[in-house]
Amino acid sequence: MSVRIEHDTFGEIEVPADKYWGAQTERSKRNFPVGKERMPIEVVYGFAQLKRGAALANHALGKLSDAKKDAIVYACDRVLNKELDEHFPLVVWQTGSGTQSNMNVNEVVSYVANTYLKEQGIDESIHPNDDVNKSQSSNDTFPTAMHVALYNEVETKLEPALKTLRDTFKQKEEQYHDIIKIGRTHLQDATPIRLGQEISGWRYMLDKCETLLSESKAHILNLAIGGTAVGTGINAHPEFGDKVAKFIAENTGYPFVSSENKFHALTAHDEVVQLHGTLKALATDLMKIANDVRWLASGPRAGLAEISIPENEPGSSIMPGKVNPTQCEMLTMVAVQVMGNDTAVGIASSQGNFELNVYKPVILLNTLQSIYLLADGMDTFNNNCAVGIEPIPENIDNYLNQSLMLVTALNPHIGYEKAASIAKKAHREGLTLKESAIDSGYVTEEQFEQWIKPEDMVEPK
């Protein structure tokens, strides 16, 4: 392998000649051969937005020349265009401040920027610390890049997937409004409900989660940049943080601002905890929805079988013809993983000792994974399951007509205890509800037909 020699304050080190990183990145690769979880490329793009904004801010404040500003912006734009992904090899399991990843970005941007300056015939050079990282510390850059990445992924991936699934349920809710089925509570028969009403509960869960997500992501717009090492802003111009946030906002289209309190921004990640709490809430709702769907579709001959769902693939390697609710199973596993991630994020956020939380990479990893899993899970569930949900009317009607809980409609006319005795008699003696009611002498056949109407039992009266 062809190599070149790079150096840092620890001395010289060999780096692959075809890679753009420098000494600190190479040391991190060697010092942390831990796991397979690479630093998510989305946070690298967040860093690129930050380094781009920092170059513009430093230039505006008279701290960076025109040529250096242009070169750094050029290099950052190449990162954002996904041209340099191969040059960011580090794993998540490194220093808890993310210093090695910050330096990885500094080194790659510096390398590309220097190549640009050389090609332009400009006699200046860019240093990864003195220029690309000017007015910054890993302690304020990593949380800034983390927030930029998280906000973008929620905005571009999670929210669209959530809205698509919600809209599918809205369409099903309206389509199946007139189908009346038996409701169930405690896994036991209950009073009638419209299939559309049942689905409306699923739809409203996603409506509510969309609102919660909008509220929680607003806090992610606060950026730590400008706090530098411990929140005091040492080595940074007083206007630096605000200017960087402004430039990031202009380039992303998102209204990022510099955090009001940098001491908080470096040592606490409660804003991400709140965001992930919303992801957990969404996961719990999706777990419930997926379980309802697979229960209602259970069968085909020995289950509830009130709805059918698409048959996507063979379900068994031994039982011919078996088809399983695989999309529901996928979504419930996604939900379980997100709930586990929430625990990790909460514990990690609680570990902010003094001026710095040093669990930032694991907070980022778990939160991004939850966003990806939920977004992909909802998209896949929608496309391969939800859009194909259809009622099985004969089974729905059979359960409805057999249910003893229709007796609830008699409460206002004969009282709870007499109605209960009718239901118990029917169950004990194998009678229909109508037969038991008439046999009890509490109601006539005419009264039963008048009072026991499922279509009158699905709205307040």
UniProtKB/Swiss-Prot annotation:
PROSITE patterns reported for this sequence: FUMARATE_LYASES
Keyword Cell division included in the entry's annotation: no
Keywords: Cytoplasm, Lyase, Tricarboxylic acid cycle
Gene3D superfamilies recorded: Fumarase/aspartase (C-terminal domain), Fumarase/aspartase (Central domain), Fumarase/aspartase (N-terminal domain)
Any GO MF annotation of the entry: fumarate hydratase activity
Transmembrane intervals: none
Site (Important for catalytic activity) location in chain: E329
Pfam families for this protein: FumaraseC_C (PF10415), Lyase_1 (PF00206)
One GO term (biological process): fumarate metabolic process
Catalytic activities: (S)-malate = fumarate + H2O
Residues reported in the UniProt entry to bind substrate: 97-99, 127-130, 137-139, 185, 317, 322-324
Family stated for the protein in its record: Belongs to the class-II fumarase/aspartase family. Fumarase subfamily.
Assembly and oligomerization: Homotetramer.
NCBIfam families membership: fumC_II, PRK12273.1
Purpose: Involved in the TCA cycle. Catalyzes the stereospecific interconversion of fumarate to L-malate.
Protein's UniProt name: Fumarate hydratase class II
Species the sequence originates in: Staphylococcus saprophyticus subsp. saprophyticus (strain ATCC 15305 / DSM 20229 / NCIMB 8711 / NCTC 7292 / S-41)
GN (gene name): fumC
